[in-house]
Amino acid sequence: MLLFYCWNHINMTDKLFAEVAGAPEDPILGVGQQYKADPRAEKVNLSVGVYQTEEGKIPVLRAVREAETRLYNAAAPHGYGQISGNPALGAFVQELLFGKDSEVVRSRRACTVQSLGGTGAIKLAADLLHFVVGKTKAATSVPTWGNHNAIFKQAGFDVSHYQYYNKADGTIAFEQLLADLRAKEAGTVVILHACCHNPTGLDFTADQWKEVLQIVIDRGLVPLLDIAYQGFDRGLEEDAFSIRLFAESGISFLVSSSFSKSFSLYGERVGGLTVVCQNADEAARVLSQVKQ
């Protein structure tokens, strides 16, 4: 009887979550749920960026299957890993981004931490830039991947935008984009799509990238290059052009990498945040903060 009384009393007085409002459904994943609920056979799921066969199955790449086999045969123990993730992954990420013989790699002036996909890398970048470096303003392209805006706002940034797409003719609104970037306050974090711009698919030419880089330098902006589709445009090396251009300039910047698409490892959440600094000592100190 006492237990029954206590239970009823708690039910009547515990209002901890009573006023919590329901959040809107994710616009992309929500479409996927609608697709599954649709009984019609003549339907195509264009919501989430996942490569599937005609039967709706995700194929396993031969390289991924071979890697899985090697790991299984090695019977590696399931102990705790490093806070920064698998160091071998970090080394390969840097090689993929900058090239094996890059000055950035040789000088060790960049640090890489493993992340929960590209989303996790962007979250780590936003937290580092806001809570450690003290940045408060960020700018994303119009349009952009929705999580760019959401993550930076959640981290405490005042998020503005720069025009990217010209709806009238389906091209990059490059002159407007340059004007918008020039108008940004010094220290603004600018999120740039390194290749395969999401969602337009339109990328800068090499000369346009050089113009953007010059404005970043002149205005004292902080670039975060997001690369989620390396190899999907012109090739692994070619798609890293913008990142290597920024590295050669000598400025400090950040790169968020995702391998969800590259290896069809959507659910494994494989990604990394790379921070390019001025020297190895600086990179070590930055890494110590990201690991917090």
Where are these regions (language model features)?
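N-terminal "arm"/small-domain region of PLP-dependent enzymes with the aminotransferase-like
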Residues: T13-G85, F92-E95, G99
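Hydrophobic/aromatic beta-strand patches that form the interior of the parallel beta-sheet core
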Residues: V44-L46, A139, S160, L224, ...
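Conserved core segment of the aminotransferase class I/II
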Residues: E248-Q292
